[in-house]
């Protein structure tokens, strides 16, 4: 592929690429909760908060996108701090229902607060100031943070809590503090994804933050796997790009995508990233054995 062909390809698929990258950021927000054993379904609600805050501050007050996105993250963290204490006292499906209810309330408010959100019509004319390379940098920073946390005491505590809460407490782990950290990080990342999306899509409407979007975000995360932070990113990139891969099979596209997802879930229960992780370990072991044999 020549440089001109590559440039043309980037122009044609720019929006699809940016969408896939933002979906990867959203998947990472869910990843942080799941790592601590929190089945948190509020991600789209905090995405909406981030998107509407960024959109309102840019369209009505003319503030720079960085300010709007930062304000959206700050507001989401405040609301997340209010929500987290009653929610984290719940377990299992009760926690899932509570966080899903929060997301539904946020969407309902976006639909009905016409004077603030412009109701079902949404916010129009949000400045398109976010570029693909901006999102790449954001995603790279988030992956670095996630990988650092995974190898730290926090990551080990999350793994222990996810595996067995009672055993984690017996080991002296402050379960509530670590779950709080995971929830708030997840909240901030979701709001960041929403703010980025507002400045890419140029329109913020309530239906973009509903149950369908939540389901797709969960699919992206679980399909990729949560054994490493790269799993959700891989899942998001694969799922988001599937419709483009199957453009020549428009009539059967949804059926093919559904069948592929079922096959992956059945045969790769730990996600798409799992065989890649195992392959990396085998390569590392073989190199170590080869190095040992040459001594």
Each language-model region and where it sits:
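Transmembrane alpha-helices and adjacent helix-loop boundaries
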Residues: 1-295
């Amino acid at each position: 592929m020549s440089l001109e062909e590559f440039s043309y390809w980037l122009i044609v698929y720019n929006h699809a690429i940016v969408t896939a990258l933002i979906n990867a950021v959203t998947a990472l927000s869910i990843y942080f909760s799941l790592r601590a054993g929190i089945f948190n379904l509020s991600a789209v609600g905090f995405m909406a908060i981030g998107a509407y805050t960024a959109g309102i501050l840019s369209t009505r007050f003319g503030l720079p996108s960085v300010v709007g996105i930062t304000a959206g993250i700050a507001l989401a963290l405040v609301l997340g701090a209010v929500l987290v204490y009653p929610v984290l006292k719940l377990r299992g499906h009760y926690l899932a229902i509570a966080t899903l209810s929060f997301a539904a309330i946020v969407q309902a408010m976006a639909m009905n607060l016409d004077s603030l959100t412009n109701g079902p019509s949404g916010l129009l004319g949000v400045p398109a100031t976010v570029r693909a390379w901006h999102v790449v940098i954001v995603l790279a920073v988030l992956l670095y943070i996630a990988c650092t946390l995974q190898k730290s005491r926090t990551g080990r505590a999350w793994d222990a809590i996810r595996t067995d809460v009672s055993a984690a407490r017996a080991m002296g782990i402050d379960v509530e503090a670590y779950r709080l950290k995971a929830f708030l990080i997840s909240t901030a990342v979701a709001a960041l994804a929403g703010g980025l999306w507002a400045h890419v899509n140029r329109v913020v409407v309530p239906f973009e933050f509903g149950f369908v979007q939540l389901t797709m975000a969960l699919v992206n995360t679980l399909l990729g796997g949560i054994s490493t932070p790269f799993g959700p990113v891989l899942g998001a990139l694969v799922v988001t790009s599937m419709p483009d891969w199957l453009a020549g099979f428009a009539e059967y596209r949804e059926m093919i995508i559904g069948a592929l997802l079922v096959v992956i879930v059945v045969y790769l229960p730990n996600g798409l990233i799992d065989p890649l992780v195992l392959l990396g370990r085998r390569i590392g072991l073989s190199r170590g054995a080869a190095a040992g044999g040459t001594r």
